[in-house]
A protein has these predicted regions:
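Phosphate/nucleotide-donor binding subsite
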Residues: 80-84, 264-267
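A hydrophobic C-terminal alpha-helical subdomain
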Residues: 2-5, 225, 239-305
């Protein structure tokens, strides 16, 4: 398919320094597009400026600044920052939606999550549900909500536990299977949809990764990758996980949200709506992720300890 997008039209990328946003920004720049990268830290945007992007510093809760950031743009990649509280999620999604409406933006690819169809009791996914609804209420906006699976990168949080305790642990049941996706696959998919702008109205697309995996299976792949064949998965209590998140610097309200999400996954409240298909399956296997990303991060941790 060839793009119908005029080459001098501007693309705006929120969260450009993050895992998905950086992939999108680099893809669009490589395709010769005009790109405006938005973030709170101008220093983290400099690598894109060096490639020809325009940097715009703004907080995601500042509707006036975001309206300026979206000014004159044809399309944007929208995402909420990591959840620190429901109140902050609401402020951010309110500001983004207001800016989209007031700027007259016509196309948006919005990072959401599988399970965002559920309106309550799913932790940070409730905020994504609300964000989808706010964007859906904007007339004239063509919005594509990407309901991505559980990020493979979330498993990087286990590195410290592997090094310190010799196990992988979180609140998920050992054998509950969930779709796991590499953020690079999300970024690549979003970039292609932005390049083509081949969607209209309000649409959702689940992205379910290469296959569904349980934490027992995840741990086995990690064990092979890092050469620790005896590594095992241990389910931790919700209270243990909540405290561990707080110890890692997650605000208490945010930690409670993530625990609520784990409960919803365990209880099969958070599940994909779409059957797995070629359209929602992405190429990066967890084995590839471990080889390409996890092992290097693990070795970096152990060498710096």
């Amino acid at each position: 398919m060839t793009s119908s997008v005029v080459s001098n039209e501007m693309y705006v990328i929120l969260g450009a320094s993050g895992n998905t946003g950086s992939i999108i920004a680099n893809s669009l720049l490589s395709a010769g597009k005009k790109v405006r990268v938005v973030g709170r830290d101008s220093g983290r945007l400099q690598r894109f400026v060096d490639k020809g992007a325009e940097a715009f510093t703004a907080d995601m809760s500042d509707a006036a600044a975001l309206t300026k950031a979206f000014g004159g743009a044809r399309a944007a990649y929208l995402m909420l920052p990591p959840a620190k509280s429901r109140e902050e999620q609401e402020r951010d999604s309110d500001a983004i939606a207001k800016a989209v409406k007031e700027s007259g933006l016509r196309y948006a690819v919005h990072l959401s999550s599988y399970g965002a169809q559920v309106p309550e009791n799913t932790g940070p996914l409730v905020g994504l549900h609300a964000s989808e609804e706010k964007l859906n209420a904007i007339s004239g906006l063509n919005a594509l909500h990407l309901r991505a699976g559980y990020f493979m990168e979330n498993n990087l949080a286990a590195i410290g536990m592997i090094y310190g305790m010799g196990l992988v642990g979180n609140a998920l049941l050992p054998d509950v299977k969930l779709p796991m996706i590499a953020t690079r696959d999300v970024g690549n998919y979003a970039a292609q949809r932005l390049l083509h702008l081949d969607f209209s109205g309000k649409q959702t697309r689940e992205l379910l990764g290469e296959r569904d995996l349980s934490m027992t299976e995840v741990t086995a792949v990690i064990a092979r990758g890092i050469g620790k064949p005896d590594l095992r998965y241990q389910q931790l209590s919700y209270d243990q996980v909540e405290q561990a998140l707080i110890d890692l610097g997650v605000p208490p309200k945010g930690a409670a949200l993530y625990v609520e999400m784990y409960k919803a996954i365990n209880e099969q409240v958070v599940v994909p709506l779409e059957p797995r298909s070629p359209e929602n399956t992405t190429p990066t296997s967890f084995e590839s992720f471990v080889q390409d990303v996890f092992v290097a991060a693990y070795r970096g941790k152990t060498s710096n300890a």
